[in-house]
């Protein structure tokens, strides 16, 4: 789904306040600490709580492999100038219906600053720039208004409600489904360009020092 450009671990995206990069094995402790919080994990389908230490390294390995194979693009969210300090994740992969789907999580210390929206917009922009896909989907639990607001601010349109299996939660839960197409994204960019990707990868692939 993704081209050769994104399949190298020097690939990153820059926004006004964030650097998005491939996850590294050094991110394991941050993932365990932040993703493992109940407030974060309970809104996701696959993040366990508590988060087993060995699961973090496995997640990083599998994520990097999927990125390298072009099957997905999942990036660590870091603050600009602090690229070694993971604060969350954002990624796009195909769901069970083989549709490209975006997902994200942010550690609770970073809530309330608009980082999730900023990161999601950057990855959405890259998705439409670097792939030939015309639509992107997402789902959120009905009890997660914060995630719904992120999707709405990214231009997603509500498609309806349904049920979805949350393996890590051990059951099926009500969700709201959203969809964004290429035309709607182009319209959003036309009046909100400052929130999109500011600079795409450079040839040297270097990240600034932390």
Tell where the protein language model's regions lie, with residue ranges.
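Short loop/turn motifs at secondary-structure junctions and domain boundaries
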Residues: 65-71
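A generic secondary-structure signal
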Residues: 62-63, 126
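Short, well-ordered strand-loop elements centered on a beta-strand within folded domains, enriched
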Residues: 64-65, 102
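Conserved GNAT-fold acetyl-CoA-binding loop/helix
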Residues: 39-62, 73-75
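Acyl-donor (CoA/ACP) binding surface of acyl/acetyltransferases
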Residues: 1-41, 74-210
